């Protein structure tokens, strides 16, 4: 079975557009779980423009399913200018205090709108390996955000990480435009084969939707997808519970 982890960032972004607690993040997490989601994902950025530090603690206190926190493990503390928002403690400090089921490590910068590339482990491999070991010593499963590059995936295995998450934007774009789709899809098939051969668990995410997900879900070895933006958009017209159920069907598990 391929697990569906629902990313709540866009729901938090709606909340933060007003000075309010609506939509309530834990309540919407529970709605997703009740509808069949296998896990919950958040990506608290240093500016806390969507998910906030307090959301992470609120979710950790109530979740009985997999809790996946994404972020750059090299990002340190950040002060906030708002009196009603806690300072960002740094990714590793947050992970150590919460101890989620899984940490997905992502090499994003403060100024990025969204995650847009995987790790370059030729450059950062030694540092990433130390951070992976630090998280694993706390009982946290680790996953590295990676491009579908066999050489980089082999380097990921050398860090000792439990899993990788394939960055799927190039597949989603090729599916949308039709440009070189078969070639791009086979890149992901090959990347998955290398990951499995290296003993890595395989996750995937970014711009997966109800149209492109069924084909991607045929890739052997895929264990989990993390989906937020498109699921939230579909929830506007379908309702959240029906959207979660639709994504489970697209994975072949609903």
Name the predicted role of every residue range:
Residues 1-69, 73-75, 79-86, 96-98, ...:
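Conserved N-terminal beta1-alpha1 strand-loop-helix module at the mouth
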Residues 49-74, 121-143, 180-204, 210, ...:
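Alpha-helix-loop-beta-strand connector modules within alpha/beta enzyme cores
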Residues 7-13, 45-47, 70-76, 108-110, ...:
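Active-site beta-loop-alpha junctions enriched in small/polar residues
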Residues 38-63, 107-120, 168-179, 235:
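Glycine-rich, proline-tolerant flexible connector loops at the mouths of alpha/beta enzymes
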Residues 2-8, 40-42, 65-71, 101-105, ...:
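Hydrophobic faces of well-ordered beta-strands that scaffold small-molecule active sites
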Residues 110, 141-194, 198:
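Histidine/lysine/aspartate-rich catalytic loop segments that bind and position anionic ligands
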Residues 76-94, 149-159, 204, 208-222:
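Catalytic cores of alpha/beta
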Residues 117, 176-181, 234-254:
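C-terminal helical cap(s) of enzyme catalytic domains, especially alpha/beta-barrels
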